[in-house]
Amino acid sequence: NPNQWRLKADLAGGGALREVGIYALQACRDLTGEEPAVISAMETKTDLEKFKEVDETIVWTMKFPSGVIANCSTTYNFNGVKHCKASCSNGWFGLDPAYGYSGITGKTSKGDLKFESGDQFTGEMDDFAKCINEDKQSRVAGEEGLKDLIAIEAIYKSIRTGTPVKLS
C-alpha cells in the first residue's frame, strides 16, 4: 500500500533501516561487544515513487576494532527474511527467524540452539514496568539507543558521500 504510514517520513521517522535494520545492527554490536570502527553503505530503490520519502533497501558493512566484519542488509521490498548468521574459524551459528514476534530458532555447527518460547515484547514491557515500580535502571540503558543512532547516522552518511565513514 503506497499510502501506509511507514512510507511517510513525517510519520515513520525513517525507513527500513530505522524500523527493521536496527535489529541487525544491534545483533552485531551485541555479538562483538564492540562498536563499529568503519561503516560502508549503499541504498537501492526499486520504486522511486513509492519510496520517495524513506529508504527501501540498504546494505552495509561494519568493520570492528577486533577485525570482525559484519555484512548487513534491510529492506521494505519484501518480507519474511529475518535471519542472522555468524561464522568464524571454528564454527558458526544462525538464527532463523532471528527477529520474529513468535519466538526464535537457531542452529550451530554443533547442533540446535534452545530458547525459551515467549513474546519478546512482553519481557520488555515487564522489565520497563519493574524499573518504574522499583526505581531501577533498565537492563537496556538509553546509551545503547544512542550508540545505535550514531551507527545509523554513519550508514546514512556513507550512502550520501559514497565513502566509508570512520567512527571514533
How should each PLM-predicted stretch be described?
Residues 17, 21, 118, 139-146:
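Conserved loop-to-helix N-cap of the C-terminal "lid" that shapes the substrate pocket in Rossmann-like
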Residues 31-35, 89-93, 152-158:
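Phosphate/oxyanion-binding loops and surfaces in catalytic or ligand/nucleic-acid-binding neighborhoods
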Residues 1-50, 162:
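Predominantly a Rossmann-like dinucleotide-binding segment in NAD(P)-dependent oxidoreductases
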Residues 65, 113, 130-168:
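C-terminal helix-rich "cap/oligomerization" subdomain common to oxidoreductases
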Residues 43-57, 62-126, 141:
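NAD(P)-dinucleotide binding in Rossmann-like oxidoreductases
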Residues 16, 20, 58-60, 136:
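Glycine/small-residue-rich pyrophosphate-binding loop that anchors the diphosphate of NDP-sugar donors
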Residues 24, 124, 148-152:
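Alpha-helical packing segments of well-folded alpha/beta enzyme cores
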Residues 26-27, 59, 127, 144, ...:
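Alpha-helical elements of Rossmann-like donor-binding domains used by nucleotide-donor carbohydrate transfer enzymes
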